[in-house]
């Protein structure tokens, strides 16, 4: 039995949950999320707690026990508080801006790069170099932030590129060069 899967999830008072078959739906002040749980995973919803249980002792159910509990916990956190990721752009002439709801990046290419965010994801730009990706689904927020970073990942020589806030980029020394 998973150590994480054994933990009980506490429900805040402003949320409502519904469990039909293998689908759980969580509704809160920020929105609604639903997810289909894998076969072999069951839920026990009592008052203001959720317990994730496995039906049987199959290897697959045991492997997915902790994962399912964490996914449900992230759904509850998302619809009550939301998630965000911050990115920074570093480099001379590198900048970003918002046009309608699309993110436009000028990061050293001969063209600008446009990114259209998926539904329920909001992208904000501060000071042309700081980007905030926010939404209720942790998985989608992380995926959009990763997509933005992959357009121009930080390079190790000058550190130019798009990085997560607080990310450490290992720097390298340049080529030694030929002495005269």
UniProtKB/Swiss-Prot annotation:
What's the chief localization of this chain? plastid
The answer to whether UniProt assigns keyword Metal-binding to this entry is: no
Compartments reported by the entry: Plastid, Chloroplast
> Cross-referenced PROSITE patterns, in alphabetical order?
RIBOSOMAL_L6_1
- Gene Ontology cellular-component terms listed: chloroplast; cytosolic large ribosomal subunit
Tell me the GO BP annotations in alphabetical order: cytoplasmic translation
Query: Which UniProt keyword terms apply here?
Result: Chloroplast, Plastid, Ribonucleoprotein, Ribosomal protein, RNA-binding, rRNA-binding
| MF (Gene Ontology) | rRNA binding; structural constituent of ribosome
InterPro entries xref list: Ribosomal_uL6-like (IPR000702), Ribosomal_uL6-like_a/b-dom_sf (IPR036789), Ribosomal_uL6_a/b-dom (IPR020040), Ribosomal_uL6_bac-type (IPR019906), Ribosomal_uL6_CS (IPR002358)
Subunit description: Part of the 50S ribosomal subunit.
Function of the protein: Binds 23S rRNA.
PANTHER family assigned to the protein according to its UniProt record, in alphabetical order: 60S/50S RIBOSOMAL PROTEIN L6/L9 (PTHR11655), LARGE RIBOSOMAL SUBUNIT PROTEIN UL6M (PTHR11655:SF14)
The UniProt entry's sequence similarity note says:
Belongs to the universal ribosomal protein uL6 family.
Q: Which NCBIfam families match?
A: L6_bact (TIGR03654)
| Protein's recorded name | Large ribosomal subunit protein uL6c
Protein source organism? Pyropia yezoensis (Susabi-nori)
């Amino acid at each position: 039995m998973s150590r994480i899967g054994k933990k009980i999830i506490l429900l805040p008072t402003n949320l409502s949950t519904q469990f039909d078959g293998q689908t759980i739906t969580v509704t809160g002040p920020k929105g609604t999320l639903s997810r289909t749980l894998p076969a072999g995973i069951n839920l026990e919803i009592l008052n203001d707690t959720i317990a994730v249980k496995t039906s049987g002792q199959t290897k697959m159910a045991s492997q997915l026990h902790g994962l399912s509990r964490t996914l449900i916990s992230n759904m509850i956190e998302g619809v009550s508080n939301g998630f965000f990721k911050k990115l920074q752009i570093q480099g001379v002439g590198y900048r970003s801006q918002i046009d309608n709801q699309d993110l436009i990046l000028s990061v050293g290419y001969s063209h600008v790069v446009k990114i259209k965010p998926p539904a329920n994801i909001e992208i904000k730009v501060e000071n042309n170099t700081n980007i905030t990706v926010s939404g209720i689904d942790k998985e989608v927020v992380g995926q959009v932030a990763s997509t933005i970073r992959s357009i121009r990942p930080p390079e190790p020589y000058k550190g130019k590129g798009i990085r997560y806030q607080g990310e450490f980029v290992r720097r390298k020394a340049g080529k030694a060069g030929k002495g005269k």
